[in-house]
UniProtKB/Swiss-Prot annotation:
The keyword Cytoplasm applies. Its cofactor is Zn(2+). GO terms for molecular function: S-adenosylmethionine-homocysteine S-methyltransferase activity; S-methylmethionine-homocysteine S-methyltransferase activity; zinc ion binding. SUPFAM superfamilies: Homocysteine S-methyltransferase. It comes from the Eukaryota. It comes from Saccharomyces cerevisiae (strain ATCC 204508 / S288c) (Baker's yeast). Its EC number is 2.1.1.10. Zn(2+) binds at C238, C305, C306. This is Homocysteine S-methyltransferase 1. PROSITE patterns: HCY (PS50970). It catalyses: S-methyl-L-methionine + L-homocysteine = 2 L-methionine + H(+). GO terms for biological process: methionine biosynthetic process; methylation; sulfur amino acid metabolic process. GO terms for cellular component: cytoplasm.
Length: 324
């Protein structure tokens, strides 16, 4: 059965919770794909051989999506987190906007074809931070207010706006308040289909640049009816597993009417210099308890981010079944 529009599902079916896939980048790495590249998880798509039917890498990507779907995911993401035009044009042979558009179209069609018409597809857009690797500090230099966020996002955003295979645009892991305010200032001509913003929040429940969730909610409420009508959900991603339920609860208290999404990482800590993950923390709770708290606090899309695997998604799916 073909999916109903995502906006209709979120707005008119308040009891329905969607299961998102896990962290695609780190899961590909687990499966032996080399993502140690300035374009990170988009690296496999940049080689011509990926597009040949016999490609081994292509098989690995398909197997990953297949395993997430078997685990219960009914909304999946394109592997385009670090496929912004700047990173791609500076680091690959794709140099023009026309070639870039063909590149994104190929990734999206490949993903849609593989997941089918029944499931939802998110067009993943990583933050400006992804280009300079500071998702977990939010340190955008001395003048974050002067960065041309629109110029940075525009080529990828325009592509996802017009691509009918994309149901929902996801701005992921946003760590800086200036960037967040920029995205929230764009009207329906600039973001013309449903979108969400995933905030990158630390263990003290602050945006990585130190902004409180209260300041963020005051800003959102202050936009009143000027807010882009396509903003469908707010949420957090790549926050640590142990803190995620508390962070979501706070967000829900500040923005009670807003549908939320949450997809924490495994709780390990990323070292950007070594590009490795460290110190697996002991999980305070299991997925079942955590997912119940998510559902009780307004979560409508639940999944995993970096270092979560199909096994995590299966546990999330069975908890969602039980509690939603
Ligand atoms: C650094 S957060 C990365 C999110 C992205 N969707 C991925 O897992 O590939
Ligand atoms: Zn992540």
């Amino acid at each position: 059965m073909k999916r109903i529009p995502i906006k209709e599902l979120i707005v008119e079916h308040p009891g329905k919770v969607l299961i998102l896939d896990g962290g695609q980048g780190t899961e590909l790495e687990n499966r032996g794909i080399n993502i140690n590249s300035p374009v990170w998880s988009a690296a496999p798509f940049t080689s011509e051989s990926f597009w040949e039917p016999s490609s081994q890498e292509r098989k690995v990507v398909e197997e990953m999506y297949r395993d997430f779907m078997i685990a219960g995911a009914n909304i999946l993401m394109t592997i385009t987190y670090q496929a912004n035009f700047q990173s791609i044009s500076e680091n690959t042979s794709i140099k023009t906007l026309a070639a870039y558009k063909r590149f994104l179209d190929k990734i999206v069609s490949f993903t849609r074809e593989f997941i089918g018409e029944e499931r939802y597809l998110i067009g993943s857009i990583g933050p400006w931070a992804a280009h300079v690797s500071c998702e977990y500090t939010g340190d955008y230099g001395p003048h974050p207010e002067n960065i041309d966020y629109y110029g940075f996002f525009k080529p990828q955003l325009e592509n996802f706006n017009q691509n009918r295979d994309i149901d929902l645009i996801g701005f992921e892991t946003i760590p800086n308040f200036h960037e967040l305010k920029a995205i929230l200032s764009w009207d329906e001509d600039i973001i013309s289909k449903p979108f969400y913003i995933g905030l990158s929040v630390d263990d003290n429940s602050l945006l990585r640049d130190g902004t409180t969730l209260e300041e963020i909610s005051v800003h959102i409420k202050g936009l009143g009816n000027k807010i882009n009508k396509n903003l469908l959900l707010m949420g957090v991603n790549c926050v640590s597993f142990n803190q995620s339920a508390l962070i979501l609860k706070m967000l829900h208290e500040h923005l009670p009417g807003m549908p939320l999404l949450v997809y924490p990482n495994s709780g390990e800590i990323y070292n950007p210099k070594e590009k490795t993950w460290h110190r697996p923390t002991n999980k305070l709770d299991d997925w079942e308890t955590t997912v119940k708290k998510f559902v009780d606090n307004g979560a409508r899309i639940i999944g995993g981010c970096c270092r979560t695997s199909p096994k995590d998604i299966a546990e999330i799916a069975s908890a969602v079944d039980k509690y939603s």
